Amino acid sequence: MIHSGRTRLEQKVNEIKVHKGIQTVERMEQSTTTGNQWSKQQYLPYQHYYHHYHNYYYYYNDHHHRHHHQHDHQHHQRQQQCCDRHHQHHQNQEYLPSSCYMSPSIAHISMSNMKKQSSGVQLTWVFHDDEAQINKKLPKELLLRILSYLDVVSLCRCAQVSKAWNVLALDGSNWQRIDLFDFQRDVEGPVIENISRRCGGFLRQLSLRGCQSIGNNSMKTLAQSCPNIEELNLSQCKKISDVTCAALSSHCSKLQRLNLDSCPEITDLALKDLSDGCRLLTHINLSWCELLTDNGVEALARGCPELRSFLSKGCRQLTDRAIKCLARYCPNLEAINLHECRNITDDAVRELSERCPRLHYVCISNCSNLTDASLLMLAQHCPLLSILECVACTHFTDAGFQALARNCRLLEKMDLEECTLITDATLIHLAMGCPRLEKLSLSHCELITDEGIRQLALSPCAAENLAVLELDNCPLITDASLDHLLQACHNLERIELYDCQLITRSGIRRLRVINNFSHLPNIKVHAYFAPMTPPPSAGASRQRYCRCCVIL
């Protein structure tokens, strides 16, 4: 008698297992324990039957075993109600990325409130009792507020709990900020269209970075459904073209931040459309949109005078004309990236510096035509400059950096890699004039010596703020520089010493035993050393070193 109720339940489960050849309950549990993700197509056919088995939990006692086998009719009614409820729920189910779905036993079944008792046989509604209590005691507004703190995955899981929670979890107010980068392989057009309709006017920020399956049709639906969007990241959405920008221009007049990094089909026409309909743009990233020319940038600058950040890394067709238009029409510009815009000259940097005094981030790396005149203009007109990247500006000398250090005292990060003409004099000027300096790259600056590092180490910036120093391929740097840095720099976190031929293994090892090293317990020193090779002839008297690198 004790096990008669369980026997009938097991019979029912066996019927379920063979019905239409569906996957067995045991297989479902195995999927859960192995961490498999279930897509909508895999998941929905099974959950209707799965709840027959799992929405009930039995525990037994000799004194009340009769509760197992009485009221069979009521038991059947409960099962039928459960099935009907979930059938209706999944008819209304939204399509979501498969990464958002969980195995049924996790997404739908909660056993956490089951308390084992030494007496009493009960048939317990485990999850639905909990849900009913939550819905009864917490008003809808409070539940919405709680759900608003969840990420995308958690919201999708909550949407699978019940019909009531589906409505709450998918309420547009919970989807104001969405980042689908983690699901980029699963996100296709129907997902974006569904999100667009669901969120509507609530959506403010959306990141589709890396979602390469997204095309113009989906983005047109998004633009039409979400007119209040303010920030949109389409980086690496390679199917996006000018059509998307035309839709944004027509429907999304509140757009302020747009990232089109590595969207190769974007042309000048896209910028002209944006300048007409998205005049509130403040930040735009056009990096590696290699079809852009001066015409598109001029149209954008004229139509979007509030621009504060313009990133055009790798836009090799841009010339001085584009930069002068930005300077003329966007005086509030604060950040500009001209990496590999090789046609830019000192004349463009001069006008940019004069007209945009609020600049705090400037990248002119690989602009090989620039000279010290550009640094002098930045020093004279941009006192708020805090980040300067000028990799491979091979015409820059100590004189330019001396002027910069004298007037730009807020500098925090400088990348001077491959500025091959600078010497220790630059370090002396930076040490005296830039007390906030946190990160400095001097890689491939082959004229830097231990004396320059010593002067830098003795400066206030090194003592209090310097955290990262990169000295890759500085052939005149020796172990003495390590001693200077370790003794004086109290916040140093990382030193790069790759291919510094005069740095020795013993110098690196000595760091562990220096008395003052205890104040830098987390410092990382990155270096590698060339292995010794056999001499080319038997009579050779010196060991030879190759440039091949062995990681330390």
Predicted regions and their residues:
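Inter-repeat linker/turn residues at the boundaries of leucine-rich repeats
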Residues: 163, 173, 201, 224-227, ...
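Leucine-rich repeat
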Residues: 131, 140-143, 160-166, 187-196, ...
